């Protein structure tokens, strides 16, 4: 048997539905579109969100908020995630990328305080939450804020 001789098992495939090809196909004449009406016409379908002239949901709901142009998007790491590193190691953006803890850095790296840290580590990041600094110091580590 060759690769070009492989065929699906008998009964495993169905013939495709040939629409509008005469009465014998079972889908002739109206071609599964029913009788008349907008959806039976060529190009005839309502656009997404159209509710028959009623004010659509998207326009009934209020607009809310905005995104500041100066918004910074930090890569986030929690203190508990730093447990994977060996005691005494220096942790920076490169080390976190290699460990797969962050996907990439846009506007910097921020360390947050979720989880517990038991090892003394040197952590270099652009920002730290106050509690994250406390937890790193309590574990005997040091915090270094690097500029962008």
Swiss-Prot record:
One of its GO terms (biological process) is translation. Residues 1-61 are annotated as: Disordered. GO terms for molecular function: rRNA binding; structural constituent of ribosome. InterPro entries: Ribosomal_uL15, Ribosomal_uL15/eL18, Ribosomal_uL15/eL18_sf, Ribosomal_uL15_bac-type, Ribosomal_uL15_CS. Residues 30-39 have a biased composition (Basic residues). Pfam families: Ribosomal_L27A. Coiled coil: none annotated. The keyword rRNA-binding applies. The keyword Membrane does not apply. GO terms for cellular component: cytosolic large ribosomal subunit. Keywords: Ribonucleoprotein, Ribosomal protein, RNA-binding, rRNA-binding. Part of the 50S ribosomal subunit. Binds to the 23S rRNA. Belongs to the universal ribosomal protein uL15 family. NCBIfam families: rplO_bact (TIGR01071). PANTHER family: 50S RIBOSOMAL PROTEIN L15, LARGE RIBOSOMAL SUBUNIT PROTEIN UL15M. This is Large ribosomal subunit protein uL15. It comes from Geobacter sulfurreducens (strain ATCC 51573 / DSM 12127 / PCA).
């Amino acid at each position: 048997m060759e690769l070009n001789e492989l065929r699906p098992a008998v009964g495993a495939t169905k013939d495709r539905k040939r629409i509008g090809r005469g009465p014998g196909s079972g889908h002739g004449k109206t071609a599964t579109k029913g009788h008349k009406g907008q959806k039976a016409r060529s190009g005839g379908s309502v656009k997404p969100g159209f509710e028959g002239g009623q004010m659509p949901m998207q326009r009934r709901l209020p607009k809310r908020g905005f995104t500041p142009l100066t918004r910074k998007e930090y890569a986030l790491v929690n203190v508990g995630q730093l447990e994977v590193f060996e005691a005494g190691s220096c942790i920076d953006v490169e080390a976190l990328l290699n460990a797969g803890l962050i996907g990439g850095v846009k506007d910097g790296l921020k360390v947050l305080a979720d989880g517990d840290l038991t090892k003394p580590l040197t952590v270099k990041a652009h920002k730290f939450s106050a509690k994250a600094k406390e937890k790193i110091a309590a574990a005997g580590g040091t915090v270094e804020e690097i500029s962008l």
